[in-house]
Every structure is written in C-alpha cells, then in structure tokens.
Amino acid sequence: MAKFVFVTGGVVSSIGKGIVAASLGRLLKSKGYSVSILKLDPYLNVDPGTMSPFQHGEVFVTEDGAETDLDLGHYERFTDTAMSRLNSVTTGSIYQAVINKERRGDYDGRTVQVIPHITREIRERIKRVANNSGADVVISEIGGTVGDIESLPFLEAIREFKGDVKRNDVVYVHVTLLPYIGTSGEIKTKPTQHSVKELRSIGIQPDILVCRSDRPINDGLKNKIGGFCGVNSDAVIASLDADSIYSVPLALKDEGLCKEVLDCLDLNDHESDLKDWERLVHKLRNPGPSVKVALVGKYVQLNDAYLSVVEALRHACISHDASLDLHWINAENIESEGAEKLLQGMDAIVVPGGFGNRGVNGKIAAIRWAREQRVPFLGLCLGMQCAVIEWARNIAGLEDASSAELNPNSKHPVIHLLPEQQDVVDLGGTMRLGVYPCRLQANTTGQSLYNEEVVYERHRHRYEFNNSYRTLLMESGYVISGTSPDGRLVELIELKNHPFFIACQYHPEFLSRPGKPHPLFGGLIQAAQMRVPSSPSEAFNPQSKIIEKKSLEQQ
C-alpha cells in the first residue's frame, strides 16, 4: 500500500512548495522508492488551459493530454517519471465532478455539501493516483497559502485523510519563510509560528518544517522553532536560497529531509544513489563558454510562461558544457525596432509557441533573420507555423501567405485549422493534446538527431500545415522531415544548406530532462557553439554522439 506525503505552504505564496515536492521525489527515488506527485490547485478553473500565460505561466501538457500547472513539469524533470491527468486537480474539476454526480442522482437525494462531498472527492482523487501509478509514495502539493479561504476544502480533505490510513502512512510537510530583518540583524521566526498555528487550527500538526531563508539557520534557531511549533528540532529543515533549482535536492538531502520523511512513514532508509545528480550540478556550476540564445516570444514579461523551454535549453547546455546566456526578446519590439538591432550577435534563436496575432510579424522577422544570417534556429508549435509562413512569403512567392488563425481572409492560408477542429466551439481541453507519433524521413537532420524512425511527442495546437501547399513549398526547397505515420500531418520541417534550421509542430521541451536533454535542443546548442570562438565543440554533425539521447551515466 502506498504512503502519502502532503506538502503545504505558509506565510507567502510562491515559497517553493513545488520544488520541495519535486526534490523530495528525487531523493525518494534515489533510495529505490517509486514516486508519483500531484498538484491540488485551489482555483475554480477546471484546468489552466484557457488561462492567460501572464496569469498562470506555462501550461504543461502530460502524455495523456491534460493541460496542467507548470509544477508538473518540475515533478517530471526531477523524478524522470511521466505524470498523467490524474496528477492535476483543481477546485473547478472537483466541483464539476461532484455536480455531475448530483445531476445523475448518485447522492440519492441528499444535500450536497463541501463536507463531506467535496472533501471526499478530493481524497478519492489522491487515492486514485496511488492506485493508478502503483507508486510506493504519493506526494501531494497543496496550492496556495495556509489561511487562504480557497485552500480550506483541500486542507480539510488532507486532515480527514489521516483517518483513512494508518498513522505511519501519512506525513505532513509544511514549507514556511524565515524573513531576515536587516535593521535588527535577526532572522524572525514569528511568521512561521503563526503559520503553524493557523495549520493547527484546521486540525493539522505538521511533522516536518521546511524553512526557507536567505542565510544559514543555526541549531539554536531550529530548537526555538521546533519548541514553539511542536516539531522535533531534527525535523526543522533549512532550505537556503540556491544557485539553481537543481541544487535543492542535494541541499535538502544534507539537511536530512528524506531521512525524516522515511522515519515518519516507517520506511527503510536505503543507501541513496545521487551520483548522476551530483555530476549534473557540478557541470552546471562549472560550465564552458557561454552561448547567446535569443528567445523571441510574446509573453516574455513573465519568464514562467516559457519555463520548460528555458529548462530544455539549460539541459542541453549542461550536456554540452556550455553556459546559457539567455536573451528575452519581445516579438513586438522586433516589429518596431527591427530584427538586426535586437538579434545581432546571437548564437541561436528560439521561437516558442503561443496563440493569437500579437507579435507574430516580429516572430516571422526573427525567423527570416535566422534563415538569411545562417543563425541556428529552433521553432516550436507556433514557431513552426511562423517559419512556414516566412518561407511561403519570401521564398515560395506567396506574398499573402498567412495562417487561418491570424488572417481568415488570406488568399494563401498555408496554416489552417485541423479538420477535426472545424466544429469545435469550447476552448478548454479541445485542442490536439497529448502524445502522438511522428515518422521521421531518412537522411534528414531531424532523423539523425533522434536516431529513431518513429518518435512520440506532446502536442497542444488547433492549426496545422496546409497540405494544399506541400508540393509548392517542397519544390522551392523546404524539407518536410517528419509527419504523422499516415503522412497526413506535417510535424517537423528543416532547411538544407543551413547550420541548423529546424521547426516542429509539437512541444519537445516537455520531454527534456536534466540528464537527458531533448535531441532538438541538443542539436541547437551544439550548432550555436560553433559560433563561439572559444567553444571546444567540433563542427556540427547531426550524427555526432554528443547529441544522441543519452543519460549522464553514459557520459
């Protein structure tokens, strides 16, 4: 039977619960335990799929097509374990399920209430993850902050949960903040005490406290916190600000977080195997020459909107002994200031996904610059669609070429709506979502990078390459290097006689891992290194073993 860990947060939002949960998952896995992690989000949206990137940040897509919180990306990257739609729970999805049951008459005419019906549904979702995944340990991160009214049903549900299992089958971890007051030169514990008091008022006594701080916490302070909060001082874990999120698992290991969790759950504390992770962090802290990568997007004001893209670039740089020098470029600024001014000197250009008209012409201008100046380029989702439009306009002679999404009146809609999307009205959860196969063409850069005939990638889009223009674009020099197995959908395009020019309709960033960078990102960084004078990289060769998919153990 599975064991359960609940991670809550206090004092402030964005305190790092997701990284703590992901780090704990990594530590447990290093000791031989299988792990699944779920996020319980207290907003009324059924999922974040229709939320603005400025509001929510990135929407992470799972293999089975769920649109989820970006924390699931952290969970997958840290544990190298695929999550599913069951691992993402929102207040909206809970209420939707309960109301649907009420409409079907499942409650036999009873009055439907937050307690017990909503809280029972939450508990059932957590147990469903345990049953579906078969994990030894299920970690649940409760979104929001203790004291928020939105989080109360979830906190009540996890309080009730301890009545469903044996005492040593559940542990409560509370992440809190220890602020430093510069004028007095002191770390203050009072906010943590009040946060724990608030949690206790709900009926939850935390077993472990993870205390965020920007400076070391001495034993005297740990004893004080433990005494006031009813926690053993050994279970007061310091979590100092780190140079990288990938350093956090090692820091929490040294603080004894995993040992305390295993003790509470009555699990054996096996010898841990973190050599690969330690090697990863060492390479991250000791990089080679930097590569300048321009990320040309429309949501660059909030970096979290492209979180997985940035992490995929970072993974590739770690693998290739490079330092990532990332330049955030607003696509709209390219429209007003020009590509040359903003992109001159870049070693690589990435144009990620997005929706709507705003900034598209700037993205197209950036792609033209990359093509004409022979700068390594990678386009993702909308980035591929913009690359097709750029080629159609400037090489294939279709001056009016556009996407049906961007210009419904275009005479040459080289990108059009997927046939199965024609009659779709609702926005939420109705796109082409999740994993689909892609057959790669032999003797192409794409096939050489993957070193596979068929690959499986995650999608999130409604629009697709218009096959009416396939012959024209191919005759003008475009290379279609990947399609759906039936050949109907164009998934991957590239250019010959260019250092590196590849664009895909899918989202490869969702499959990149710290120890296993995605081949497309690996190829981009290796090509970018060729533009760095002091780079040790050899001439770019897509068949090079450097860019094959491999783990750090093989390096």
Curated annotation (Swiss-Prot):
Give residue spans, biased composition: Polar residues. 534-544
**Matches recorded under CDD domains:** CTPS_N (cd03113), GATase1_CTP_Synthase (cd01746)
In terms of InterPro entries, this protein maps to:
Class_I_gatase-like, CTP_synthase, CTP_synthase_N, GATASE, GATase1_CTP_Synthase, P-loop_NTPase
Listed name of the protein: CTP synthase
Which residues take part in binding ATP?
A: S14, I15, G16, K17, G18, I19, D71
Q: Where is the composition biased (Basic and acidic residues)?
A: 546-555
The record's region (Disordered) falls at 534-555
The record describes the protein's role as: Catalyzes the ATP-dependent amination of UTP to CTP with either L-glutamine or ammonia as the source of nitrogen. Regulates intracellular CTP levels through interactions with the four ribonucleotide triphosphates.
Q: What else is known?
A: CTPSs have evolved a hybrid strategy for distinguishing between UTP and CTP. The overlapping regions of the product feedback inhibitory and substrate sites recognize a common feature in both compounds, the triphosphate moiety. To differentiate isosteric substrate and product pyrimidine rings, an additional pocket far from the expected kinase/ligase catalytic site, specifically recognizes the cytosine and ribose portions of the product inhibitor.
Q: Which PANTHER family match?
A: CTP SYNTHASE (PTHR11550), CTP SYNTHASE-RELATED (PTHR11550:SF0)
Q: Which gene encodes it?
A: pyrG
For this protein, the record's PROSITE patterns field holds: GATASE_TYPE_1
Q: Domain of life here?
A: Bacteria
- Annotated region (Amidoligase domain) at 1-267
Q: What is its EC number?
A: 6.3.4.2
Q: Which UniProt keywords apply?
A: ATP-binding, Glutamine amidotransferase, Ligase, Magnesium, Metal-binding, Nucleotide-binding, Pyrimidine biosynthesis
Pfam families given for it?
Answer: CTP_synth_N (PF06418), GATase (PF00117)
Name the residues annotated as catalytic in the UniProt entry. C381 (nucleophile), H507, E509
Residue sites binding UTP per the record: S13, K188, T189, K190, P191, T192, Q193, K224
Activity regulation note:
Allosterically activated by GTP, when glutamine is the substrate; GTP has no effect on the reaction when ammonia is the substrate. The allosteric effector GTP functions by stabilizing the protein conformation that binds the tetrahedral intermediate(s) formed during glutamine hydrolysis. Inhibited by the product CTP, via allosteric rather than competitive inhibition.
One Gene Ontology term from the biological process aspect of the record: pyrimidine nucleobase biosynthetic process
Task: List positions binding L-glutamine.
Answer: G354, L382, G383, M384, Q385, E405, R462
Q: What does the similarity note say?
A: Belongs to the CTP synthase family.
Quaternary data:
Homotetramer.
